[in-house]
Design a protein with these regions (language model features):
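Short pre-active-site segment immediately N-terminal to the catalytic Zn-binding motif
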Residues: 156-173, 199-205
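Active-site recognition of the HExxH zinc-binding catalytic motif
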Residues: 41, 103, 150, 173-186, ...
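Short helix/loop segments within enzyme catalytic domains
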Residues: 90, 94-96, 106-108, 210-255
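Pan-zinc metallopeptidase signature
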Residues: 255-309
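Post-HExxH zinc-binding segment in Zn-dependent metallohydrolases
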Residues: 2-16, 199-230
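Catalytic zinc-binding patch centered on the HExxH motif and its immediate surroundings
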Residues: 124-151
Length: 309
């Protein structure tokens, strides 16, 4: 989706560097989002613990390779929708702004007070309260510091290695998905991923598919979200936009990544859901009419083949 050129971007919730400090693990990455899936594949191929993000205690320190995107550079560069259409980091900022505007309006309808997450845009690696974030892991949400961590170079990985197209909504879908994990955290649902962490019908898969559905809810309403001056953030959704989002959802399906990585599909080890299910739940969110209950993946017996009614 393209941003309206005159919309004003707000960088007040955008940071650089880690939210957790130090090298120790302050908590688990619950609902680790798309990044968690990539990490699991890396662990499968190269060994290691695929259940949590690596920390400096169990991997080589990044040392001088640890980089941050300068806060001041983002504030100077990311001012308008025109910047969001031109620069990846600014598109992240704009998507966060729009998602914030949407969920700040929606959550009170369900008796929940909205609280804003922090979004950390980094390059290379940085620290979070859940351990070390790196561009090998990809985007994730850390519930301990209520922050989204994202390296813009992940979008190149998504297209070059996993087959997504490079449309704007493919990238915005990733951000909206991670924002969806924050909404799950506010709703008290995120911990269910840990209680049942693996398998096609597991709590982990249901949490991820719900975040996809939340992303679809935002996408359908994004063109109505407004900045502080009443300007709408994004232009109306097009069929090409939807195709881009669905290509990204399919690219990070467990079956797609397993087939690419190991040449076979093992549903019993899934943590995020199949390509078809991820697409279906994103569409379900788009068709939900802003009814969050339509995204209740725990209300169906099989989230791979069923959609909440």
């Amino acid at each position: 989706m393209s941003f309206n050129d005159n919309v004003q971007l707000d960088t007040s919730s955008i940071g650089s560097g880690g939210g957790g400090g130090g090298g120790g693990r302050g908590g688990l990455v619950v609902g680790g989002g798309i990044g968690g899936l990539i990490l699991a594949i890396l662990a499968m191929l190269f060994g290691g613990n695929g259940g949590t993000l690596p920390t400096t205690q169990d991997q080589t320190s990044y040392g001088d390779n640890v980089q941050s995107v300068d806060d001041s550079a983002i504030k100077q560069q990311c001012k308008t929708g025109a910047d969001a259409n031109k620069y990846v980091e600014c598109r992240i900022v704009g998507t966060v702004n729009s998602a914030e505007a949407y969920w700040a309006q929606e959550l009170p309808r369900y008796g929940k007070k909205f609280r804003e997450p922090k979004t950390v845009i980094y390059s290379g690696a940085t620290q979070s309260a859940c351990g070390t974030a790196s561009n090998q892991v990809g985007p994730f949400y850390c519930p301990v510091d209520e922050s989204i961590y994202i390296d813009g170079s992940f979008f190149d990985i998504l297209t070059q290695r996993f087959g997504s197209d490079d449309g704007a909504l493919a990238q915005e879908y990733v951000v909206a998905h991670e924002y969806g994990h924050h909404i799950q955290n506010v709703l008290g649902l995120l911990g269910r991923a840990q209680q049942d962490p693996q398998g096609a019908q597991s709590g982990a898969v249901r949490v991820e598919l719900m975040a996809d559905c939340f992303g679809g809810m935002w996408a359908q309403a994004a063109a109505t979200t407004q900045d502080a001056n009443g300007n709408t953030y994004l232009k109306p959704l097009t069929q090409d936009d939807v195709r881009s989002a669905l290509s990204a959802a399919a690219a990070v399906g467990d079956d797609n990544i397993q087939e690419r990585a190991q040449g076979r599909v093992t549903p019993e080890s899934w943590t995020h859901g199949s390509a078809d299910a991820r697409q279906n739940w994103f569409i379900a969110g788009m068709k939900s009419g802003n009814d969050i209950n339509k995204c209740n993946t725990f209300s169906v017996d099989d989230p791979e083949t069923q959609i909440a009614s």
